[in-house]
């Protein structure tokens, strides 16, 4: 049987980091087993579902590179199908109409709690075979088996058993004519031929209810894999403040999509001690049965380390568009400075994120207006005009502006003055960047461009008072 998995988010908000990991594991399992991956949008919550959230989910999936074979499929476009299946269950005596008011349901709940019992529907209408009538309280309830136990082998958690006596006759169609989650998801997974349902372990209690519906329909029951949640660095439930952010906020924070994929893959799954994986290695090695049954903790330092690895090792040309995105966010005119790929080469050993890289790179795209006063006092004092002047002279004479030719000119300047490179580099670094910290001096000067470098040296000479 062909493996078919699905990712089925509700568009009531952004795609957060836990949802992204679920999508990744579903995608990896399908790809690893040569199957198909389906994207379904569970948008039947009409009050909370928004088009903006749908767009955000699709954008995040695209950014992460999690392509789907089918979809997006929208539940709101399948209402007639849910009604058809509900009517089938009614005709077979496996579901029934119920008309209890909110007050009657509240009274049932209070009576159960008074007896220290689990609040539940008492099944009063179960055998009454009430006909359809136009009533604002009308629902359709599923006849859950009264006896026996639901047993399933979870691919991550192992054997799980829940007695049917713990379950009541749940609503499968609401008064507004829309299906409930537990019913719609079964019909969808049945129709779509889903063979593996991979989701968070907050759905474990839904699973026995869903299995009973599958069996009532005579539908094949998929295999289930319930992943533990992701905790924050203190071991508490994730919040927006501690990492449960929109996936696209990780893009805005300067993380590479494949770095986030690598990190999320390891957040609950492992292959020996290996930390870094190519996408192909993940496809070859991933098996949902190897996912840890214990909750994983988010580790932002680890994510930073993974991201820096890819910043250091990826082709600079592939990183350049993402650096340009960060520069544009800072209001930088990209055309006013060096090629982004050259900036990547210069800065990637010094940063963990593209946001940091962009912030450091601004100096090459905008006029230098401020200087670190401590750097000026130390390196742009009287006497510095000599190495700066010689460097300017030889840089102005460079034929083809390149890192190599800039480096040669600076070494020639140092040799002509019989100075160590530090005596040339430090005043030049302050002249070009306004600070005493920058990448290799040849790269620093090269990125300023010939005209920009000469202008900045001239400004520094004026500052020294030796122009």
Swiss-Prot record:
It is found in: Cytoplasm. ATP binds at residue 240. A motif ('KMSKS' region) lies at residues 237-241. InterPro entries: aa-tRNA-synth_I_cd-bd, aa-tRNA-synth_I_codon-bd_sub2, aa-tRNA-synth_I_CS, aa_tRNA-synth_I_cd-bd_sf, Glu-tRNA-ligase_bac/mito, Glu/Gln-tRNA-synth, Glu/Gln-tRNA-synth_Ib_cat-dom, GluQ/Sye. GO terms for molecular function: ATP binding; glutamate-tRNA ligase activity; tRNA binding; zinc ion binding. GO terms for biological process: glutamyl-tRNA aminoacylation. Its EC number is 6.1.1.17. It catalyses: tRNA(Glu) + L-glutamate + ATP = L-glutamyl-tRNA(Glu) + AMP + diphosphate. Keywords: Aminoacyl-tRNA synthetase, ATP-binding, Cytoplasm, Ligase, Nucleotide-binding, Protein biosynthesis. Pfam families: Anticodon_2, tRNA-synt_1c. It comes from the Bacteria. The keyword Repressor does not apply. CDD domains: GluRS_core. One of its GO terms (cellular component) is cytosol. A motif ('HIGH' region) lies at residues 9-19. Catalyzes the attachment of glutamate to tRNA(Glu) in a two-step reaction: glutamate is first activated by ATP to form Glu-AMP and then transferred to the acceptor end of tRNA(Glu). Belongs to the class-I aminoacyl-tRNA synthetase family. Glutamate--tRNA ligase type 1 subfamily. PANTHER family: GLUTAMATE--TRNA LIGASE (PTHR43311), GLUTAMATE--TRNA LIGASE, MITOCHONDRIAL-RELATED (PTHR43311:SF2). Monomer. This is Glutamate--tRNA ligase.
């Amino acid at each position: 049987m062909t493996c078919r998995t699905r990712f089925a988010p509700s568009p009531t908000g952004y795609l957060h980091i836990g949802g992204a990991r679920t999508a990744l594991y579903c995608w990896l399992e399908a790809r690893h087993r040569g199957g198909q991956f389906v994207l379904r949008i569970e948008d039947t919550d009409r009050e909370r579902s928004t088009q903006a959230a749908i767009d955000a989910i699709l954008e995040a999936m695209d950014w992460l590179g999690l392509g789907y074979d089918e979809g997006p499929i929208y539940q709101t476009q399948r209402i007639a199908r849910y009604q058809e299946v509900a009517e089938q269950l009614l005709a077979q005596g496996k579901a029934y109409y119920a008309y209890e008011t909110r007050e009657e349901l509240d009274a049932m709940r209070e009576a159960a709690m008074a007896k220290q019992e689990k609040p539940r529907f008492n099944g009063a209408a179960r055998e009454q075979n009430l006909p359809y009538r136009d009533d604002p309280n009308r629902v359709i309830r599923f006849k859950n088996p009264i006896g026996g136990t639901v047993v399933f082998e979870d691919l991550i958690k192992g054997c799980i058993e829940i007695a049917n006596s713990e379950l009541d006759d749940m609503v499968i169609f609401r008064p507004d004519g829309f299906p409930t989650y537990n019913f719609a998801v079964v019909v969808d997974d049945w129709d779509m031929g889903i063979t593996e349902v991979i989701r968070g372990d907050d759905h474990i209690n839904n699973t026995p209810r869903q299995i009973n519906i599958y069996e009532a329909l005579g539908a094949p029951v998929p295999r289930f894999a319930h992943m533990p949640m992701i905790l924050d660095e203190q071991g508490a439930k994730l919040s927006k403040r501690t990492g449960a952010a929109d996936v696209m906020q990780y893009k805005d924070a300067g993380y590479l999509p494949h770095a986030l994929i690598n990190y999320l893959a390891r957040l609950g799954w492992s292959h020996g001690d290996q930390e870094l994986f190519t996408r192909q290695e993940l496809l070859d090695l991933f098996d949902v049965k190897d996912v840890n049954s214990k909750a994983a903790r988010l580790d932002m330092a680890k994510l930073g380390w993974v991201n820096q690895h890819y910043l250091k090792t990826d082709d600079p040309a592939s990183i350049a568009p993402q650096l340009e995105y960060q520069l544009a966010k800072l209001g930088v005119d990209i055309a006013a400075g060096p090629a982004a790929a050259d900036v990547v080469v210069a800065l990637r050993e010094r940063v963990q994120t593209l946001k940091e890289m962009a912030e450091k790179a601004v100096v090459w795209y905008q006029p230098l207006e401020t200087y670190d006063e401590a750097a000026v006092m130390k390196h742009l004092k009287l006497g510095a005009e000599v190495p700066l002047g010689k460097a300017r002279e030889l840089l102005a004479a460079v034929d083809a502006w390149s890192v190599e030719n800039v480096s040669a000119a600076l070494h020639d300047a140092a040799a002509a003055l019989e100075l160590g490179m530090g005596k040339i580099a430090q005043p030049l670094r302050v002249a070009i960047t306004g600070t005493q910290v920058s990448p290799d001096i040849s790269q620093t000067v090269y990125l300023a461009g010939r005209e920009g470098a000469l202008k900045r040296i001239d400004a520094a000479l004026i500052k020294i008072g030796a122009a």
